[in-house]
């Protein structure tokens, strides 16, 4: 809510409840066929980015999460197994890794799983069972907790595991901000900084070369 207030107070107009049908050279067309003209467009639609920008190598990577009932003090800080990075960087096989985060409510958020090539958002019972068995291996007492909800989501993944931040290869008026996988919110401020620096032709304190979309085209043709 505070972010929304800040955006509006700085002169932006928010259009909510509308879907972008297409990105064109000088703007976007939304689902009521209204055309919104713009000097540049930022495609920051996560794993759905390829639907609006053809040719970018971003794939959906499905994940499961589970949240428990309230157990204040059960875990006081996030715990992650060392193999989490290996799971996160796997590019082919389904994988699970132990990750638990206590919430302010006293609930425990438990993950994680990763699956490529899955379009359905339905709960995958076998992969969920693997994920929870992994968690209980690390913390046996988790088996005594009650869960209240399980859900899935899709991460936006790139071949080299780095996000695409910068101008599209085929449209200089289009900028991409996608492919962050599970770190989109965590790295959002840095992503915004890199984008703004490129748009206003300002030297960035953050190296931009590793994130330029052009590098993925180079990888695919290497």
Language-model-detected regions and their locations in the chain:
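Short beta-strand to alpha-helix junction loop
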Residues: 1-6, 122-127, 186
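C-terminal catalytic lobe of FAD-dependent flavoproteins
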Residues: 126-130, 136-222
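Core beta-strand elements of the Rossmann-like FAD/NAD(P) dinucleotide-binding domain
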Residues: 31-40
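Active-site-proximal alpha-helical segments within enzyme catalytic domains
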Residues: 5-6, 40, 44-45, 190-198
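Helix-loop-beta segment of a Rossmann-like dinucleotide-binding subdomain
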Residues: 1-10, 113-116, 172, 178-180
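Helical element adjacent to the flavin cofactor pocket in flavoenzyme catalytic cores
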Residues: 1-25
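Active-site substrate-recognition segment that forms the wall
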Residues: 40, 47-150, 154-169
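Glycine-rich, N-terminal phosphate-binding loop of Rossmann-like dinucleotide-binding domains
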Residues: 45-46, 178
């Amino acid at each position: 809510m505070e972010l929304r207030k800040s955006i509006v107070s700085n002169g932006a107009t928010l259009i909510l409840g509308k879907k972008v049908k297409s990105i064109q050279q000088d703007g976007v067309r939304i689902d009521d066929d209204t055309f919104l003209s713009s000097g540049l467009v930022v495609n920051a639609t996560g794993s759905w980015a390829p639907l609006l920008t053809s040719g970018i190598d971003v794939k959906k990577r499905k994940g499961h999460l589970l949240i428990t009932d309230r157990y204040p003090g059960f875990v006081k800080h996030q715990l992650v197994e060392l193999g989490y990075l290996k799971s996160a960087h796997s590019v082919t096989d389904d994988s699970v890794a132990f990750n638990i985060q206590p919430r302010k409510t006293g609930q425990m958020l438990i993950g994680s799983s990763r699956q490529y090539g899955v379009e359905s958002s339905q709960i995958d019972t076998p992969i969920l069972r693997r994920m929870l068995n992994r968690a209980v291996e690390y913390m046996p007492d988790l088996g005594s907790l009650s869960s209240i909800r399980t859900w899935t989501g899709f991460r936006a993944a790139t071949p080299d595991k780095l996000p695409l931040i910068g101008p599209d290869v085929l449209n200089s008026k289009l900028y991409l901000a996608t492919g962050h996988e599970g770190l989109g919110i965590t790295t959002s401020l840095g992503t915004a900084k890199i984008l703004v620096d490129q748009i206003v032709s300002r030297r960035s304190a953050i190296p931009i070369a590793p994130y330029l979309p052009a590098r993925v085209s180079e990888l695919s043709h290497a």
